[in-house]
């Protein structure tokens, strides 16, 4: 969880977590308890926040905005509950081009998965018809409402009064590599995937992240990347 990671590093002192799903918040609260982090959880949608005006210093989220139907209404709520000078920070939002690009390694990974399983000695994962029907990925077209063009995403916060809006891209090579790895691994039973492979996949992903961070993200336009990061400030 994005907020718990920040809180564990001492970057958040008073944490309030919201979600439309009670089950998700229950899971978050359990994890927070294990980490020794105090958190208040509130079931709500982003377009109708049940908080007084000027309640928070920061409103943040990871992979949240593309699930919200009415973004203008949500950003008006973010603006309302922020104190003057407060910030919004959203990470992990899919770009339209990056989302299309990710489909290539996803398909490729599934295509080469049988050969990969033989190579690493992993067992094929089989699903019952009931499991296939309940697969959470089948819900993606229903819950993934937006894939963003950076210019369009950048235009949303100012309509609610925000200033200093910034959008940048994150992950290009790491995205292609990571989705390929995840697609292959999703075809195998988790316990049968060798530790050496897991270690290789993780470290190679981190290596490609460094390539993105140092060589690509500073120079290429945001729309080429898989993830978009948005920040803006409420006037003081």
Locate each region found by the language model:
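Class I SAM-dependent methyltransferase SAM/SAH-binding core
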Residues: 1-48
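A short acidic, Gly/Pro-enriched loop at the edge of an enzyme's catalytic core
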Residues: 47-58
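A short SAM/SAH-binding and catalytic strip from SAM-dependent methyltransferases
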Residues: 58-70
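A short glycine-rich, Lys/Arg-flanked "PGG" loop and its adjoining helix->strand segment in the class I
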Residues: 72-87
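Conserved class I S-adenosyl-L-methionine
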Residues: 87-128
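Acceptor-substrate binding/catalytic loop of class I
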Residues: 136-152
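Conserved S-adenosyl-L-methionine
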Residues: 150, 162-173
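C-terminal lobe and adjacent flexible extensions of AdoMet/dcAdoMet transferase-like proteins
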Residues: 160-161, 171, 180-194, 201-236
């Amino acid at each position: 969880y994005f907020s718990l990671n920040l809180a564990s590093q001492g970057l958040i002192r008073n944490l309030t977590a919201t979600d439309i799903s009670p089950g998700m918040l229950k899971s978050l609260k359990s994890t927070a308890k294990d980490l020794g982090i105090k958190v208040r959880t509130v079931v709500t949608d982003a377009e109708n926040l049940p908080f007084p005006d000027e309640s928070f210093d920061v409103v943040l989220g990871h992979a949240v905005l593309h699930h919200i139907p009415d973004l203008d209404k949500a950003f008006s709520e973010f603006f309302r509950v922020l104190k003057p000078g407060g910030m919004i920070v959203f990470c992990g939002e899919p770009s339209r081009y990056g989302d299309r690009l990710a489909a290539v390694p996803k398909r490729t990974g599934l295509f080469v998965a049988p050969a990969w399983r033989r190579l690493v000695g992993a067992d094929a994962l089989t699903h019952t018809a009931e499991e296939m029907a309940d697969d959470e990925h089948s819900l993606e077209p229903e819950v993934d409402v937006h894939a963003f063009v950076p210019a369009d995403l950048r235009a949303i916060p100012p309509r609610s009064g925000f200033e200093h809006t910034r959008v940048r891209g994150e992950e290009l090579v790491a995205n292609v590599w990571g989705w390929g790895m995840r697609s292959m691994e999703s075809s195998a039973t988790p316990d049968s995937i060798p530790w050496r492979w897991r270690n290789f996949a993780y470290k190679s992903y981190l290596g490609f992240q460094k390539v993105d961070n140092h060589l690509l993200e500073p120079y290429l336009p945001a729309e080429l990347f898989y993830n978009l990061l948005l920040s803006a400030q409420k006037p003081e």
